[in-house]
Structure formats: structure tokens, C-alpha cells
């Protein structure tokens, strides 16, 4: 099946982009594996006009927004993000009225419709820097409450998180899990995603996005790392650092990320059916806050 996918990909002129949380078999056939922003930026650099995207809907849409002239297809239309879907345009409008003048900073894990109402987009890697560089002591931030609280801690600014209980179910780790792994691996370094709850972040050695997690073993000579994010990241790290050991903090599985399989990836290439289509107006409006992020980050 892998050979068939690679053959069809070449014949039809597709590039395969896969998120870090995809199953190992899909990461291995991808031309590029990364976080949502790395993938969107990669798509902008490509001369190829056809992209098969392996991730969830908001990520595929981000690629389309930044590459409106390219054809973007996905293997499963139902692969979505429950956290992104919790935030609605109505909630954003309501908070804009409550806090006039406060910029709306939306995490990239948000719907395209919501992005059209944002002042700036951020990622888990640059959220702290983006908020720091905004000329405002108060920001409205969504949809991840934990990331918003982390940003508040690091910037000293007032961060109003929306919606009320926005969080990623996959990253709801237990602080006790860190105690347990420290007993089992006393020399290990613990790295957790900023979407984790505060008690977990406070007990970790490092807090970072998946892109940042990849850089830590380059600087830290530890032999064992405990990873607090979706299980797919373990494969990426083991591949990059074969001489180190990577242990999951907990068995954190994103069921939506795992909806993509070798079978439906092959089917996507055969039929080219699930194309990502967005209204022109949404693309134009959602692109502005994304470009603002690039501007702020220099």
C-alpha cells in the first residue's frame, strides 16, 4: 500500500504534508512532518500546486488560506478539533463588546471563521512573544485556556481567555504522572506542551510546542526525555534522535488525528475527492491576522 501511495503521489504531482501527531506509518511516507505553522509555511515554499494534508481540518484550512492557488486535499473530512470548535464567532463578538480596545489573539487551533475576527493569530511556539509585542496590557485570547494562562504568566499581561472552558482534552495530563515518571526515570527530563494544565507545567523541566520539543535534545545531553504531548510526537523524536530514549508522560491519543490512515490516504490520492474549499472572503479576512503574526515575529 505504501508503494502504491508513493507511486500515485508522484504520478499526480502531490506533496504530502503530515502533522507531528499522525500515525508513524503516515509520518514515514510524508515529504515533510511538522507542526501546523511549519506545515503552512512549507506549503508556501513549494512549487508543487497539489498538497495532500494529513492532520485535522483547521490545519488543512490554514494551508489553504496561505496558499489559495493550490489544491489541498485531506483523507477524512471528519478529522476535526473539538477545542477549536468550542470557540464561536458569537463569543468573540460578545467579548469584543465587553472589552473594547483589547486585541483578539487567536491560537492557530481555531476555526477559519473565527480567524476572520482576530487581530492576530499565534501558535503555541510564539504565543508568548506575540502577546509581548502587542501594544496592549489586556488581550482577549482563545480558545485554549491553559495556553492563555501560560501567556499571562510569562508576559505579566491580563489575558482574558475565551470560551469559558476551552482546553485540549488530549493535553489534560495529571501532575501525579510526573511524580511517577520521576521515580521510574530519576535522570529523565520532562517536557510538556503549554496546552497542559498549570500543575503539570510547573512540575516539568521544559514547557514547549512540538517544534520546540524537537530542539531541546540538541542542547540538553540527557539520555531520557519524558514527553507530555500527543503520542505521535514520540515517533518523530525517536527518528530524529535514535540514540536517546523518549517516554510518553501518559498515553495521550488524539482520535481525530488518528482518523487518517494508509487506507484513506491512498483513497484520497485515487479520488482527489475531499478538497479543502473556503469562500474567498474567508480566505482574505483570515489571512490578515496570520500575516500580522509574521510581521510581529519579524
From Swiss-Prot:
Necessary cofactors: [4Fe-4S] cluster
Co-factor binding comment: Binds 1 [4Fe-4S] cluster per subunit.
Keyword match Cell wall biogenesis/degradation: no
Location of the protein in the cell: Cytoplasm
Gene Ontology BP term (one): 'de novo' NAD biosynthetic process from L-aspartate
Pfam families named among the record's database cross-references: NadA
EC number: 2.5.1.72
Binding site for iminosuccinate: 19, 36, 107-109, 124, 193-195, 210
Top-level EC class as recorded in UniProt: transferase
Reactions performed catalytically: iminosuccinate + dihydroxyacetone phosphate = quinolinate + phosphate + 2 H2O + H(+)
Residues where [4Fe-4S] cluster binds: 81, 168, 254
Key words, A-Z: 4Fe-4S, Cytoplasm, Iron, Iron-sulfur, Metal-binding, Pyridine nucleotide biosynthesis, Transferase
Signal peptide from the UniProt entry: none
Pathway: Cofactor biosynthesis; NAD(+) biosynthesis; quinolinate from iminoaspartate: step 1/1
A Gene Ontology term for the protein's cellular component: cytosol
GO molecular function list: 4 iron, 4 sulfur cluster binding; metal ion binding; quinolinate synthetase A activity
Family of the protein in this entry: Belongs to the quinolinate synthase family. Type 2 subfamily.
HAMAP family linked: NadA_type2
General function of this protein: Catalyzes the condensation of iminoaspartate with dihydroxyacetone phosphate to form quinolinate.
Entry protein name: Quinolinate synthase
Species for this entry: Thermotoga petrophila (strain ATCC BAA-488 / DSM 13995 / JCM 10881 / RKU-1)
Gene name of this polypeptide: nadA
